[in-house]
Swiss-Prot record:
<dbReference type="GO" id="GO:0043487">
    <property type="term" value="P:regulation of RNA stability"/>
</dbReference>
<feature type="domain" description="Sm">
    <location>
        <begin position="10"/>
        <end position="69"/>
    </location>
</feature>
<keyword id="KW-0346">Stress response</keyword>
<dbReference type="GO" id="GO:0006355">
    <property type="term" value="P:regulation of DNA-templated transcription"/>
</dbReference>
<dbReference type="InterPro" id="IPR005001">
    <property type="entry name" value="Hfq"/>
</dbReference>
<keyword id="KW-0694">RNA-binding</keyword>
<dbReference type="GO" id="GO:0005829">
    <property type="term" value="C:cytosol"/>
</dbReference>
<dbReference type="InterPro" id="IPR047575">
    <property type="entry name" value="Sm"/>
</dbReference>
<dbReference type="GO" id="GO:0003723">
    <property type="term" value="F:RNA binding"/>
</dbReference>
<comment type="subunit">
    <text>Homohexamer.</text>
</comment>
<dbReference type="GO" id="GO:0045974">
    <property type="term" value="P:regulation of translation, ncRNA-mediated"/>
</dbReference>
<comment type="similarity">
    <text>Belongs to the Hfq family.</text>
</comment>
<comment type="function">
    <text>RNA chaperone that binds small regulatory RNA (sRNAs) and mRNAs to facilitate mRNA translational regulation in response to envelope stress, environmental stress and changes in metabolite concentrations. Also binds with high specificity to tRNAs.</text>
</comment>
<dbReference type="Pfam" id="PF17209">
    <property type="entry name" value="Hfq"/>
</dbReference>
<dbReference type="InterPro" id="IPR010920">
    <property type="entry name" value="LSM_dom_sf"/>
</dbReference>
<protein>
    <recommendedName>
        <fullName>RNA-binding protein Hfq</fullName>
    </recommendedName>
</protein>
Amino acid sequence: MSNKGQTLQDPFLNTLRKEHVPVSIYLVNGIKLQGQIESFDQYVVLLRNTVTQMVYKHAISTVVPARAVNFQVEVPAE
């Protein structure tokens, strides 16, 4: 994954995690998962509901927060 992808997704996912925002995660096969983001890394997201699920990022189509979130994107010096 490119650096630009990480500079967008990491602050977004981290804000959702820190603020305990409920999310709907849609997978590429159309399945909808709901819960709160517990943790994430380069390849997976841990989604907590009644149980914690490990969801591979390559299977995720869309992440939809239950409410609007504000997050800061750090622009790397070029």
